[in-house]
């Protein structure tokens, strides 16, 4: 495969499906791929418009209209309790429409320690799912939601006694979690770890049953049977990132302004490893930092640790081959328009790193796409980067992985699971070939929905385009994508269901007359001072556009009749005609 390797030493804008970074892979022997443009939704090369603006839109949904302040987690919990106590209507039933073939933003994946065929996955707003066949088919874990657990899943781990832990909450979204939940029977029943609330990360080792938690109250640990969590004395503030070695010896975490701390004695003591790169330390004051620890020890009998620092783009990457004692920066800042553009203005939204299990000197980094770094020089450590996935090719291409990667997990046979805004992707050959694994994994985030008179449904989704289901595909819940990017509000004509209206960022509005097979854009009449629709970041065009298809005249309606006058009338005369059906006048 002739891929280019980069060697490095010590609401609404035009849709995002374009071919950035495609050139280096077009030279490969994988075949020739067309860019996944979906016609009118092609853009100028940017993958997405919107992690920050999508979050801003979501936060606006959680503002109290009376106070103007964001609704607190405590208030949301109170509201949920009130709703749960309301009497249910006995006359209303719901049927799930799907999609069962398209996923959504996935922050957490966990492979069962006792059975690698069983895999759990969690969406940031879709709840918990389980697969019993390595991700081929997923089923919702209803018992998790029925227990009162929060559907906003941030992280998962499983201790050696088989207890599964699911963390809820986020440091970015407007919603918080309602604690860390655990199951001792593979998801059949659930309980809450005492006194937990918003938790962004949980990890565990292969040597004991402690679960370590990154929380707003610092680093905590707990095991089944403990009356309360134990606070781990690192420093004050929020624990923002956390990883642990399989043998439990090494714990690396970040606090506050992402200051790095390392423990080499299983969490008994921590050392501050923040400082300048020139002093072989990890700089702090990064908006986001992610860590990874090697599964095995390196040739010097130490663990290899990695740190990836980002703002909107890459700030730096660092490696330590001596259990975190000293660190070497092996790449510095990079971002658009550079070809080496891992995060593409979204470094605080999508960032993840993992060490290849059998090679402490090789990592995979997830941003918009997935990249590999392999160390080729020992002193100082340096090597080359290689892009191993592309979001912009057709989904059946062997190099396709959906954009915006958030999670990476390996099973004991080195089968690799990636969680992203499109759901779950899998590789069994270290990233040389990929396939999507979303059947039944319905965690898609919808901005708006529409339906027609025959029962077909359509919806605009976060980073999964505009989707349409007229129940004619292989399953009742299978959708097809009729538009790209972030789909927003949409409409289907009642009079002619072949007519559809869809929207994407910044007032881009489109019409289809053939059920979404082809589209044409149209623009409303605007003042001359307005930017053209689709203008990136325009103050005149909001990220999210709301539309309403006004179909007031229905020639088939029975609520009006034609009347033939039998005499002359003057303008303004009142005419009363008794209704033959009820005696009421019309």
Residue spans for each PLM region:
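Transmembrane helical bundles and short interhelical boundary loops of multi-pass, membrane-embedded
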Residues: 2-3, 22-25
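N-terminal Sec-pathway targeting helices
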Residues: 1-11
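Beta-propeller blade termini and top-face loops
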Residues: 25-586
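Hydrophobic membrane-insertion alpha-helices, especially the h-region
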Residues: 9-20
